[in-house]
Curated annotation (Swiss-Prot):
AMP-binding domain-containing enzyme; part of the gene cluster that mediates the biosynthesis of the psychoactive metabolites ibotenic acid and muscimol. The first committed step is glutamate hydroxylation by the 2-oxoglutarate-dependent dioxygenase iboH, and the last step is decarboxylation of ibotenic acid to muscimol by the decarboxylase iboD. The order of the intermediate reactions is somewhat ambiguous. IboA likely activates the carboxylic acid at position 5 to introduce an amide bond, and the flavin monooxygenase iboF generates the N-O bond. Pathway: Secondary metabolite biosynthesis. Keywords: ATP-binding, Ligase, Magnesium, Metal-binding, Nucleotide-binding. The FACS motif is required for catalytic activity and substrate specificity. Belongs to the ATP-dependent AMP-binding enzyme family. It comes from the Eukaryota. The gene is iboA. ATP binds at residues 180-191. One of its GO terms (biological process) is fatty acid metabolic process. Its cofactor is Mg(2+). This is AMP-binding domain-containing enzyme iboA. Its EC number is 6.2.-.-. GO terms for molecular function: ATP binding; medium-chain fatty acid-CoA ligase activity; metal ion binding. A motif (FACS) lies at residues 397-447.
Length: 520
């Protein structure tokens, strides 16, 4: 395969379809009611490529009819968790457009439209169920129908020929995707452009980390990483396409250990890739069930990222021969750290090939260095690294400051020690800016609240602890105070991602005046 074409992911797909088209790329569950699936449809590379071309003709025809020129950014608003969501994204690229991946958890129209403007998007394509999020849209819009309802023959005409692969093989610096960070900054996620070079680096070098350097006689079968509106699942797709591996989709991301057994026995699943919160129940099952333990022990890798598992579970897995692998990554840079060999998974080391630096962490609030007994280090990706993001995402020194902290061990490995700011993570690894929520409450509830603190690391939703003024709780019930706070937060919540919102009064806790640690 021509080296220049290999750097274009559509060229890679066409090449694989031609030369190894019978290789299975996806295994999709056949769902019948609420019962766990027992059968999976196998989709080969050739079948996937043909479906991409069919849908690409449709979207190209529709976009041209709406005056959207090739190489335009096109926003797609959907869950990203369905097979057809991936088809639509790759079909847009096949038709010479640049998808901007917009997850369904963004529900405020103003935020969505602002993100479209930042990416230079010309139109929004959306899941029909998300129509309310496109209200008063200043851009053209088009609902995405199920791909099986698309009649390609009705759109074929003299102008319907797809671009040649050579025409798509643009320069390394050309953007081929826009992604969004998983948490809001100043009320909005950051727009992260991915270039052709950046994407090819993912599948040509980075995906080898997922394979941990070992070769097997049978196909690598990876558990799906979930919504392609996040970077990890699209890396997984490219990597599996490039290496001849396949992706196995479960009925849902939080599935039972019983279904895991079926995934292994029926689909040949041999590499787990998930969040720590979704892995933990299977580890608990393995502690009680020898069959579940054997299943995890025989996996080629059990990798997780974004959200850790407990130290106790990590140690137990290490002692019981479960091949755990922790992966530290960012939307902007991809994978930067991976588990060091011969130790529990939480002990990590930088991945080969990146250029990085660890600087001592200084508390910018007080200007004082952190205590010497726990030397925290900031991870910085240097400008000459192959995975360096676009200039607009870099600091003034030309490097990328991750904002994450690590503690170096005597053997040279590193332990992740959280972030250097006030962020926490939800249970599925999405960031929450607790400081922004606290500041808003102090602003809109200044007559009611003396102080507040937002907590909930690795929980489904943040929780709010309020120290109310004595006069507030003497004139209104606790439930009444909670409801009043929620009403005053409505406008703020509307602009936040779903996982960042506090909308349930059961997640608000009133403490006596003087009992909130941050305010005493």
């Amino acid at each position: 395969m021509d080296v220049a074409l290999e750097d274009n992911h559509i060229a890679l797909l066409q090449h694989r379809a031609k030369n190894s088209g019978n290789t299975v790329l996806f295994k999709l569950p056949i769902l019948r009611g609420s019962e766990p699936p027992q059968e999976w449809n196998h989709i080969t590379v050739a079948e996937f490529a043909a479906e991409v071309d069919r849908v690409a003709i449709f979207v190209m025809t529709e976009l041209k009819a709406r005056g959207i020129p090739p190489r335009s950014a096109v926003t797609v608003l959907y869950s990203g968790s369905r097979y057809q969501d991936l088809i639509y994204a790759i079909a847009l690229a096949r038709a010479s457009y640049i998808p901007q991946m917009c997850p369904h958890i963004l529900t405020h129209p103003g935020v969505i439209f602002a993100l479209m403007e930042k990416a230079g998007s010309k139109i929004i394509l959306y899941d029909p169920s998300l129509e309310p999020a496109t209200t008063d849209c200043p851009y053209p819009k088009m609902a995405l129908n199920p791909i099986e309802t698309i009649d390609s023959s009705s759109t074929i005409n003299s102008d319907s020929a797809l671009p040649t692969i050579e025409d798509l093989s643009s320069g390394h610096a050309d953007v081929c995707f826009f992604y969004l960070t998983s948490g809001s900054t100043s009320g909005s996620p950051k727009v992260v452009p991915l270039t052709q070079k950046f994407v090819s680096t993912y599948y040509k070098t980075q995906f080898g980390i997922w394979l941990d350097g070992r070769r097997f006689d049978t196909q690598n079968a990876f558990l799906s990483r979930g919504s392609i509106c996040a970077v990890a699942p699209i890396i997984q797709y490219f990597g599996c396409l490039y290496t001849g591996s396949c992706i196995v989709q479960p009925s849902k991301m939080r599935f039972s250990t019983e279904e895991l057994l079926t995934l292994v026995n029926v689909c040949g699943l041999n590499r787990m890739t998930t969040f720590g919160t979704w892995l933990a129940p299977h580890i608990q099952a393995a502690k009680k069930d020898p069959a579940a333990l054997k299943l995890l022990q025989e996996m080629r890798t059990v990798s997780y990222g974004g959200v850790p598992i407990s130290i106790a579970d990590d140690d137990w897995c290490f002692q019981n021969g479960i091949p755990l692998m922790d992966m530290y990554a960012t939307t902007e840079c991809g994978t930067l750290m991976v588990s060091a060999p011969g130790k529990p998974a939480r002990f990590m080391q930088p991945v080969p090939g990146i250029s990085y630096r660890f600087d001592p962490f200084t508390d910018t609030t007080t200007g004082a260095d952190n205590p010497a007994s726990t030397q925290l280090l900031k991870l910085i990706l240097l400008a000459d690294s192959p995975q360096i993001p676009q200039p607009q995402l870099l600091s003034e020194d030309g490097n990328f400051h991750t904002g994450d902290l690590f503690e170096k061990q005597l053997d040279g490995s590193y332990l992740f020690r959280g972030r250097g700011d006030d962020w926490i993570k939800s249970e599925d690894s999405r960031f929450i800016d607790t400081k922004a929520i606290e500041e808003k409450i102090n602003d809109v509830c200044s007559d009611l609240v003396k102080g507040c603190i937002v907590v909930g690391h690795l929980r489904p939703s943040p929780a709010l602890f309020i120290e109310a003024y004595h006069d507030s709780i003497s004139t209104i019930s606790e439930d009444g105070l909670k409801e009043l706070v929620l009403r005053r937060l409505e406008d703020f919540n509307a602009r936040q991602l779903k996982h960042e919102r506090i909308t349930d009064k059961r997640l608000i806790f009133i403490v006596d005046e003087g009992n909130l640690p941050r305010t005493v």
